[in-house]
Structure formats: structure tokens, C-alpha cells
Amino acid sequence: MIRVRIRRTFQTKNHSREKYNVPHIDVKDHLPYKTLLYYVDDSDGDSVFFKNTVSDNILLDTDAVIDKKISPKKGRAVYFDGDIYHSGNCPIDFNKRTVINFDFKV
């Protein structure tokens, strides 16, 4: 296990469903690794996954290309390579969004 983190974001009315937080990878100095996101409760504020990886050397705020969006549903888990850029979004309709993030070597 490299890292376990619980992240809770709260409702914001000035955020848009079309926007997302800054794309990132979790732990740059431990590549390669896997990430598992576990959604603690139902919410909105999708997780956004990009086609881009760390090796693409892109400008994240202008060049990132969205691959898919995953909605937080209680008990849902998403497993992916740790070098894939991803981002969360603050909830708009729900009061909170809680995710447990596991980064680990396989």
C-alpha cells in the first residue's frame, strides 16, 4: 500500500457539471501503481478520467481529453492505472461527496 486517503467535498452552487477540478495523478514518485476509488455514498460530482497519462507531457488545463465520467454511487469502486490523469467534481445537488482513495503496488 502506498497511500490511503479519504476525501470529502461539499456542495457548491457556483460549480458546473461541465467543469471539473484540476486533472492529476495521485503519487508521481511511485509509478507504476494502481488506484482504486471507493464511493462511500450516493452523490453527484462525477469522477472524470482522461485519455492522457503522465508520459503524454501535456498542459492539463488546455490539452486534457476526457475519456469517461463515473458518477458516485454508494458501494461503487473504480480501478485504474495510477498514471491516468483523473479529476473529481464538487457535488451540486447533494450535500457531500465522499471517496476513499487507495493507491498501491500490484
What label would you give each PLM region?
Residues 1-106:
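Catalytic core of non-heme Fe(II) oxygenases with the double-stranded beta-helix
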